[in-house]
């Protein structure tokens, strides 16, 4: 907390001394939608099958489940093979409003640059990039307020199941993204605090050293992609400003 003395980060959701670990400062920030953005797009593509009035029964349900399971994998493969900026499609990730920085739930998302040559993987790629740009906007706010962001630790389903998305995040942020090895990080963290409170370890740091599982994946930014994403991020900011100006219309 000494490094943060007198610093109050504007536009985040919370900043409390000792809220996470005693003697340290906890700062809360996040996006209103990340994985939900991909789920929304998947639902759009699946709608003709899921909502079909012409089919039903176990065979139809099995077909829907099979396509649903493979759809996202196929989208990620196709999107990952396409160069950054190749489609000129740009998206804004405010499909559920904006949480950080500067919360405003009245804001809405956008997709621009569409043409008859754009396909589903192009749009999906733009949505993945948009969620990464949203994360960069948060990191940028911290850095502008004097809080360095040197690396990101990712946990949960998306980082483990979707390496394309996590690699894009590293490319956009320009810093390494480590993926926690544990699939139950929240439960593991609770167990660490319980072990400390029960006197098994003298502090949370010791519990982390003894009980932590470390990381099993690390994604490092690819210089060429990162350079291109700097340019696209500026366009993302311009689109953000336009959508903010349209909020009340």
Predicted feature residues:
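Glycine/Thr-rich phosphate-binding loops that ligate phosphate moieties of nucleotide
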Residues: 2-249
